[in-house]
Amino acid sequence: MRYRLPSAILLMTFAAGAAQAQWQPLPESAPAPADNPTTAAKVELGKMLYFDPRLSATGTVSCFSCHNVMEGGDDHMPTSAGVHGLKGGRNAPTVFNAAFHSVQFWDGRAPSLEEQAKGPPVNPIEMGMPNLDAVIDRIRHIPGYKPYFEQAFGAGDVVTMDNAAKAIAAYERTLITPGSAYDKFAKGDKTALTAQQARGLQTFADVGCVSCHSGPNFSGPALPQGEGFFMKFPTFPDSPYVVKYKLTEDPGRAAATKDPADTGMWRVPTLRNLVYTAPYMHNGAVKTLPEAVRVMGSTQLNKSLSDAEVADIVAFFESLTGPFPAQTMPRLPPTPGDLLE
């Protein structure tokens, strides 16, 4: 069943306040910086590097290991496993629509996709390489990569870490999911949502979720690249969910900035494709989407949402699932026999 919103509700939905500019569709393409325009050659190279486990110390972990683009762009683990079976401290966020974030990582420590791509290879838990020089040396020792770098960046000394990061970022900018039922609604098709999804949209606005989750990506307002949108979590530390799900054990952005004022501050995540990205929260402690809605209502809004409200909001979140871009595994250049010695 599809539902046409009554005019009174439409007026409320598009009224002043946080919801005024809220209902925006996801753009059909992701923005790219002036120094890294997206090209087919960069995307092809970036996809290869994204899938290549040889960028890790053990030759066993790739970007794809934690951000599975064949499904929801994450790994469905509370926290991810890296080299030598080590476990990270935070939930792997989805890579889908990451291109619409103005900063990257839960704590916003990377100002761009290009800089984010340089982080995991040298994280001692994730991919375990000693430094970025070691990463690019590993790539240079795979001769089959050089023609792809030259196609993407021209002749000369182009097999560099900066170019590798640019290529990965270019590929990630193709990982977007416009065209959801919600996007059709936001473009003017008021019959695109079911009755329950329409109620969920209204509840989402009425209870205050849009104070954080606004904009086309439902991750906050559009900001200049490198300027992140952060919110305190939990806002109401007396919520019983704080202890139940250990929500304050991680200092959040303060771990990156070393500023005590940033304790408990987190980059606001996207709500798109949530049905594909369980478990939830920065520590992956909440297993189901209805429970995540209850947790956020309590910790952020000091509200105990009814079962009906939770069900309607979850239905609305289902309308944020867009068609995923088709993905295939790339063929990688052959491995020299001494590469992983």
Feature map (PLM): residue ranges:
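Helix-loop "lid/cap" segments that line or gate small-molecule binding pockets
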Residues: 121-122, 135
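Phosphate/oxyanion-binding loops and surfaces in catalytic or ligand/nucleic-acid-binding neighborhoods
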Residues: 69, 98-102, 120, 142, ...
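C-terminal capping alpha-helices of c-type cytochrome domains
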Residues: 132-179, 267-269, 275, 285-341
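Short glycine/threonine-rich turn/loop motifs
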Residues: 22-119, 183-294, 301-303, 328-341
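Glycine-rich, positively charged N-terminal anion/phosphate-binding segment
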Residues: 129
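Positively charged n-region of N-terminal signal peptides that target proteins for export
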Residues: 1-5
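Class I S-adenosyl-L-methionine-dependent methyltransferase module
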Residues: 125-126, 152
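Bacterial N-terminal signal peptides
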Residues: 6-17
